[in-house]
């Protein structure tokens, strides 16, 4: 049985690695991108994702622009997206997403949210 894949879109290397290692230990496959443009390129090239963890403040293409483009793509808009950001709740609420997590990330809450969208 193939494990669900979590696609982490995060520019901070330490945060990205911490999230990836934690999720891999919990049985998930992980894909990573350092900004929204890298993620869009990989997803449109056929990389599959069960759920996306999306930072908002990134260089090249931020999370807001990624979500605008994701919503325009019939396949990508179906992928549940969890915003994971240091932006305040009000700022995060300005973007449509399936769930929101504040940084620093509570790993138990992260696991709960991810598992809501894909079971291991």
Predicted regions and their residues:
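Hydrophobic/aromatic residues positioned on beta-strands within the core alpha/beta folds
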Residues: 84-85
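Conserved acidic carboxylate
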Residues: 10
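Receiver (REC) domain active-site loop signature in two-component systems and cognate sites
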Residues: 58
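Acidic, metal-coordinating helix/loop segments flanking the phosphotransfer/catalytic sites
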Residues: 32-51
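Active-site residues of response regulator receiver
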Residues: 55
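Charged docking surfaces used in two-component/phosphorelay signaling
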Residues: 17-25
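C-terminal output helix
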Residues: 105-118
């Amino acid at each position: 049985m193939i494990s669900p894949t979590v696609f982490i879109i995060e520019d901070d290397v330490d945060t990205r690695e911490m999230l990836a290692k934690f999720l891999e230990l919990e049985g998930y496959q992980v894909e990573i991108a350092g900004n929204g443009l890298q993620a869009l390129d990989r997803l449109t090239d056929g990389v599959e994702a069960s759920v996306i963890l999306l930072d908002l403040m990134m260089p090249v293409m931020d999370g807001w622009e990624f979500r605008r483009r994701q919503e325009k793509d019939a396949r990508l808009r179906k992928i549940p997206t969890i915003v994971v950001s240091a932006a305040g709740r009000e700022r995060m609420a300005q973007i449509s997403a399936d769930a929101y997590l504040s940084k620093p990330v509570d790993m138990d809450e992260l696991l709960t949210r991810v598992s809501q969208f894909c079971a291991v």
